[in-house]
Amino acid sequence: GKDESEWTCVFHGSTLSKKERTIMLTGDSGSGKSSLSTILMGNNFSLIADDFSPMSISGNHYNFPSAISIKQGFYKPASKLFNDFVNLKQYFISETKGNVKYLPPDNKNEMVLNTHCDKVFSVKFGKNLSNEIKEVNKGIALNKILPDAWISNNMEHVKNFINWVKETTFYDLTYNDNEKIVKMINKII
């Protein structure tokens, strides 16, 4: 294990990998981030971390295995991607969140313990939104992800974080069609 001095930051995001290419999905609660993670897992991506994505001083994102919480509105698409989804126990969270099921990381895909992530997507799902991925200015992207991130105040970690930002491409991603957005992501990675 690593001790606190080895962690540069923790993001509020989901990190996934496919064929040694790694992406992170960020977005507000209810933005479709967990749904897109589930869709990508059903399309040969390995889940590295969901909702809590730690990055070490070496710039690698580490496996933080936890189940993805799937809201009731996404049960039908999730059950098409994962045969045993219907058998998962349902939990009532609150009046606002409603019922959820917890989908564990898919063991048919390769388990990735740590990897370098150089593409970050700010996700937004909406039935009236177009399927679009566009590169965005790093400053604008950081304004979205930093409020929910923890960054070490150690100067070496801060420098490593800045270097990671310089090497990383940030995107805004909107979608309404699962198959189309998977194809678009696969082209970018």
Language model: regions and residue ranges:
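Glycine-rich, often acidic-flanked micro-motifs
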Residues: 14-27, 42-189
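Conserved glycine(s) of the Walker
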Residues: 31-32
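Post-Walker A alpha-helix
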Residues: 36-37
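Extreme N-terminal, non-catalytic leader segments
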Residues: 1-20
